[in-house]
């Protein structure tokens, strides 16, 4: 049974009628452009074929009824005519409530809805299960009530819900790629203007995500520290964000900066350059250049931004030893654990899977990896 069929079946069981519509919103992986989003820079993610699915229908009352199929059909009911506050018990419900509340703040005109939510985006792996949920809820209400909201507005609404209602700091990339992703394309996103450019993926290339299963322990405190260091560097150069610093200027006077701050700035400034070049390399089908840029990105994250850990570095080395110049591999996400992403010919996937299974536990204290083979997928919409 597909995720769509499963969600529809639970809807019928819970509400005793057919849903009006079923919609989906995907998770994502970032191919290159790490810690550039909050520096007003560039990122190059793609949506993946792991997604949140919602079967839904309108209600005659002004209530939102939500069933979480993946949490033993836990239920949340709240009114559109009363202040929407965080749920006393269910963390998942806050993502739904936050999206609904922020749609109201945008003066969107909608009534009650019955929703059944299910998904297969791995949680805690840095593949944006939360952004997928936020965009899916927004898309469900938009589709039910024909709300005049663009994909960018749905993404911004999800980001606001996560930042202000749920209380998690995040950039706009995750929601934007979930809302706007295109089949068989990555999306070059300008995080300042929110302009996007669809970048075709080469044929017969797999997007492989490997979870190190190293828990991302320091990520919140270290994220905040890195962000402050980037802001310090931007102030030194008298610009709004590091995106505005010319690389030649930076290299000519980087010695005047605090050494650690200089390293952080060097990563962001060079990563923006790499990301723009990578979009062109990918569009041209130049996997050799793409692989070189992904390698440079990983080295920069390891040595300048200092956000990798030894098991992650080992995992990258194992994959690189198999794919050589036929693709690329690097850590993806906030750092200190989590996942790596690799682009490779479909023909090498099983060879990589075998090499990682055989070699990785020796470098990871006996941990085993989780292996996902993905394709670049369509963003939110009817399914």
Curated annotation (Swiss-Prot):
Q: Name one Pfam family in it.
A: GHMP_kinases_N
Describe its function.
Catalyzes the transfer of the gamma-phosphate of ATP to D-galactose to form alpha-D-galactose-1-phosphate (Gal-1-P).
Say if the entry is tagged with keyword Magnesium.
Answer: yes
**Known EC number(s)?**
2.7.1.6
Residue positions binding substrate: 34-37, 223
Q: Has keyword ATP-binding?
A: yes
Alphabetically list the UniProt keywords.
Answer: ATP-binding, Carbohydrate metabolism, Cytoplasm, Galactose metabolism, Kinase, Magnesium, Metal-binding, Nucleotide-binding, Transferase
What NCBIfam families would the database entry show?
gal_kin, PRK05101.1
- What's the protein name? Galactokinase
Query: Which Gene Ontology biological process is one annotated for this entry?
Result: galactose metabolic process
**Stretch forming the signal peptide:** none
Write down the InterPro entries for this protein, in alphabetical order: Galactokinase, Galactokinase_bac, Galactokinase_CS, GalKase_N, GHMP_kinase_C_dom, GHMP_kinase_C_sf, GHMP_kinase_N_dom, GHMP_knse_ATP-bd_CS
> What family is this?
Belongs to the GHMP kinase family. GalK subfamily.
Q: What pathway annotation does it carry?
A: Carbohydrate metabolism; galactose metabolism
- The primary site where this protein sits is cytoplasm
Annotated catalytic residues: 174 (proton acceptor)
């Amino acid at each position: 049974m597909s995720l769509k069929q499963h969600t529809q079946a639970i809807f019928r069981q819970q509400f005793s009628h057919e849903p009006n519509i079923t919609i989906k919103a995907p998770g994502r992986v970032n191919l290159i452009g790490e810690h550039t989003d909050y520096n007003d820079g560039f990122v190059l993610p793609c949506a993946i074929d792991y997604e949140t699915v919602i079967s839904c229908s309108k209600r005659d009352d002004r209530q939102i009824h939500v069933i979480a199929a993946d949490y033993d059909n836990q239920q949340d009911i709240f009114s559109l005519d009363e202040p929407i506050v965080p749920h006393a018990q269910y963390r998942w419900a806050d993502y739904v409530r936050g999206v609904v509340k922020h749609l109201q703040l945008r003066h969107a005109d909608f009534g009650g809805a019955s929703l059944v939510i299910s998904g297969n985006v791995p949680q805690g792996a840095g593949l944006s299960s939360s952004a997928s949920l936020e965009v899916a809820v927004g898309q469900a209400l938009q589709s039910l009530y024909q709300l005049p909201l663009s994909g960018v507005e749905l993404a911004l609404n999800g980001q606001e819900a996560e930042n202000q209602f749920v209380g998690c700091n995040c950039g706009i990339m995750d929601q934007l790629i979930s809302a706007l992703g295109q089949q068989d394309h990555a999306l070059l996103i300008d995080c300042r203007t929110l302009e996007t450019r669809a970048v075709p993926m080469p044929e017969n290339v797999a997007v492989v995500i490997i979870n190190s299963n190293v828990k991302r322990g320091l990520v919140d405190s270290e994220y905040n520290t890195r962000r402050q260091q980037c802001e310090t560097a931007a102030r030194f150069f008298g610009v709004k964000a590091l995106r505005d610093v010319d690389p030649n200027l930076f290299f000519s006077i980087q010695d005047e900066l605090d050494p650690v701050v200089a390293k952080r700035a060097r990563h962001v400034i060079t990563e923006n350059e790499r990301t723009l070049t990578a979009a062109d390399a990918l569009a041209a089908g130049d996997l050799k250049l793409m692989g070189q840029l992904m390698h440079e990105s990983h080295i920069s994250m390891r040595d300048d931004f200092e956000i990798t850990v030894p098991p992650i570095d080992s995992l990258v080395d194992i994959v690189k030893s198999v794919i050589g110049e036929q693709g690329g591999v690097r850590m993806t996400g906030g750092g200190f654990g989590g996942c790596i992403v690799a682009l490779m010919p479909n023909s090498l996937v099983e060879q990589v899977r075998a090499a990682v299974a055989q070699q990785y536990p020796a470098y990871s204290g006996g941990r085993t990896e989780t292996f996902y083979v993905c394709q670049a997928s369509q963003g939110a919409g009817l399914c």
